[in-house]
């Protein structure tokens, strides 16, 4: 973008930012409620003068930077979304299948994926603080790599959330059926569906408040388990047989054979457990302060250490990897396969007392994922549509900042949850998930690579690092390391899919885990054919747009806030500066 175009866009940003969105007319409660669903027209469209002078690409960038979301999310919301978003069935139940590969394999797998996740969140926070747009991952890829890459990543990531929604609704139903097996499971699907949609109809505040309290419940439950686990390892407990320590690391051992293949087998389970951590970056458009996003991202290190690594070590000490109950669960929500329940049941009566509590924890965890699916998918749909990558109708926003069309599309996918009454629902969801099986790794790679490209473009165009609102603690090297690590994780997953542990190779098994790769390639090629662009395979560093994508006034205010915070932290004692470095 040349100097004239940059100045023109800045004028539009400044002149339109002072205009306010039209308020709901009338004082009648019913009238206000009805009006809240009307389209939230952009201030630029109302003024129309300078906006009409922009090119189509500039209009898209302006619309992305000025989306009419309500900035209602506080620091406490973002922190709990970042923590609670990852505490789901992947941790409470899925950990069991990974433990069957051996406690050392489980620990190494979680350390590798955790290191990748740390890089991803830091890179994502840097980009989202700089360019706070809805559907940020896909749109950042379109800005820093190539529009076709961005479209492919965006569709794949969106599919992951849309397909997860009905699956988690089924999970809610199966979990509740533990207490009421005689009730038609479709009834529980309907209740979970209505509740999750209603919470999101209250906007970002409704989603965030519900996530806040559900996350507190999950965190308390996990802390209780950690404390009980430490006591049991030390030889305490009502029916203790003495000190356990690392007994099961020696017999039956630390690694299941074959070692490397079992290690690779833990990657997808670990990724599924960590998935959702990056969602805190999606909230940047609705956060009261950009600094809240950066603070939440910084805390990722401690969340990984406390909630995953410590838990994995305790589970590995309390449950032998050859326990048949680890892989005997009838579904991904079967608490009998939960290593938490197995660990406590190994002590005698405690296991029967805790099963109902653990089922409640799993129910909260599964419903929390349902809630997140509606929130994340609707924002992704709205962002992609605003960027011109989906039909314009999908960009519809009402006056309360709710992407109603995006929510409706997610709700339509949610109706697949009623397949719970079908005998073939397991097969259906297995192949639906195959559509986005390892999209975790491809999305995470893309986030890290975008940050690397952003830093390279800043250097190539002679920009100062002071212009970066929030700099990743790991710098560009964290992005490079994250890229390499995610490529290795994908290679490991392809290997174990082609030659699975304990069963012969088959095309069905391979595509169950790797179908997303050819689908992403097909979407990429299809978008490139649609664009009819075969000359430019990537955006050159000098051509990357570093200026648009944020409101000028908000950008300057955020820089001022950042500088004041730096001065405040530098005036504090050493212990506080260390604390703020990590948190």
From Swiss-Prot:
Membrane-side (Cytoplasmic) residue stretches: 1-77, 124-143, 204-215, 275-298, 378-402, 450-473, 527-583
Topology within the bilayer? Multi-pass membrane protein
Which residues get modified to Phosphothreonine?
Answer: 21
Q: What is its main location?
A: membrane
In terms of superkingdom, the source organism counts as Eukaryota
One Pfam family name is AA_permease
Keyword entries, A-Z = Amino-acid transport, Endoplasmic reticulum, Membrane, Phosphoprotein, Transmembrane, Transmembrane helix, Transport
Subcellular location as annotated: Membrane; Endoplasmic reticulum
Q: Which residues lie on this side of the membrane: Extracellular?
A: 97-101, 165-182, 237-254, 320-356, 424-428, 495-505
Segments passing through the bilayer:
78-96, 102-123, 144-164, 183-203, 216-236, 255-274, 299-319, 357-377, 403-423, 429-449, 474-494, 506-526
Q: Which InterPro entries does UniProt cross-reference here?
A: AA-permease/SLC12A_dom, Amino_acid_permease_fungi, APC_YAT
Instruction: Give a Gene Ontology cellular component term annotated to this protein.
Output: endoplasmic reticulum
- Keyword match Transport: yes
Q: Name one GO molecular function term.
A: S-methylmethionine transmembrane transporter activity
Q: Which residues carry this modification: Phosphoserine?
A: 6, 23
Biological process GO terms, please?
amino acid transmembrane transport; S-methylmethionine transport
Q: Quick check: keyword Transmembrane helix in the entry?
A: yes
Annotated family: Belongs to the amino acid-polyamine-organocation (APC) superfamily. YAT (TC 2.A.3.10) family.
Q: What does this protein do?
A: High-affinity S-methylmethionine (SMM) permease, required for utilization of S-methylmethionine as a sulfur source.
Name the chain's protein. S-methylmethionine permease 1
What would be the name of the gene that encodes this protein?
MMP1
């Amino acid at each position: 973008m040349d100097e004239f175009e940059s100045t023109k866009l800045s004028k539009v940003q400044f002149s339109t930012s002072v205009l306010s969105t039209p308020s709901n007319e009338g004082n009648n409660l019913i009238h206000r409620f009805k009006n809240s669903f009307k389209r939230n027209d952009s201030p630029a469209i109302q003024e129309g003068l300078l906006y009409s002078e922009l090119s189509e690409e500039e209009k898209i960038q302006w619309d992305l930077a000025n989306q009419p979301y309500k900035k209602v999310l506080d620091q406490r919301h973002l922190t709990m979304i970042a923590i609670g978003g990852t505490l789901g069935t992947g941790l409470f139940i899925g950990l069991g299948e990974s433990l069957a590969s051996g406690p050392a394999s489980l620990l190494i797998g979680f350390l590798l994926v955790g290191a990748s996740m740390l890089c991803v969140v830091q890179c994502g926070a840097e980009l989202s603080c700089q360019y706070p747009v809805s559907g940020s991952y896909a749109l950042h890829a379109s800005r820093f790599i190539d529009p076709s890459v961005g479209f492919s990543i965006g569709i794949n990531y969106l599919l992951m959330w849309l397909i997860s929604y009905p699956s988690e609704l089924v999970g809610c139903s199966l979990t509740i059926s533990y207490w009421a097996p005689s009730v038609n499971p479709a009834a529980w699907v309907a209740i979970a569906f209505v509740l999750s949609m209603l919470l999101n109809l209250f906007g970002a505040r409704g989603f965030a408040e519900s996530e806040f309290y559900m996350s507190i419940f999950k965190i308390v439950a996990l802390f209780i388990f950690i404390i009980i686990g430490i006591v049991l390892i030390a030889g305490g407990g009502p029916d203790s047989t003495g000190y356990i320590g690392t007994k099961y690391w020696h017999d039956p051992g630390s690694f299941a054979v074959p070692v490397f293949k079992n290690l690779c087998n833990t990657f997808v389970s670990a990724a599924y457990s960590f998935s959702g951590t990056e969602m805190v970056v999606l909230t940047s458009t609705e956060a009261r302060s950009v600094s809240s996003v950066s603070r939440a991202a910084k805390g990722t290190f401690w969340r990984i250490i406390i909630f995953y690594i410590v838990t994995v070590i305790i589970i590995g000490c309390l449950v032998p990897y050859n326990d048949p109950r680890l892989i005997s669960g009838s579904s991904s929500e079967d608490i009998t396969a939960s290593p938490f329940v197995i660990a406590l049941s190994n002590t005698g009566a405690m296991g029967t007392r805790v099963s109902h509590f653990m089922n409640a924890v799993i129910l909260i965890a599964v419903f929390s994922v349902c809630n997140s699916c509606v929130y994340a998918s609707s924002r992704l749909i709205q962002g992609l549509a605003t960027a011109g990558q989906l039909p314009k109708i999908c960009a519809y926003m009402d006056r309360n900042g709710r992407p109603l069309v995006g929510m409706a599309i997610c709700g339509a996918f949610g109706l697949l949850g009623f397949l719970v009454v079908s005998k073939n629902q397991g097969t259906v969801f297995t192949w639906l998930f195959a559509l986005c099986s390892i999209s975790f790794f491809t999305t995470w790679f893309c986030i890290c690579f975008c940050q690397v490209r952003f830093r390279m473009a800043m250097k190539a165009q002679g920009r100062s690092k002071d212009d970066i609102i929030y700099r990743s603690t790991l710098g560009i090297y964290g992005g490079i390391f994250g890229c390499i690590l995610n490529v290795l994780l994908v290679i490991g997953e392809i290997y174990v899919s082609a030659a699975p542990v304990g069963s012969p190779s088959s095309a069905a098994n391979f595509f169950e885990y790797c179908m997303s790769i050819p689908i992403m390639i097909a979407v990429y090629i299809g978008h490139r054919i649609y664009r009819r662009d075969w000359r430019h395979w990537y955006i050159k560093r000098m051509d990357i747009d570093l200026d648009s994508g944020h409101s000028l006034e908000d950008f300057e205010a955020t820089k001022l806030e950042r500088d004041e915070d730096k001065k405040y932290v530098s005036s504090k004692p050493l212990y506080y500066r260390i604390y703020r470095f990590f948190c």
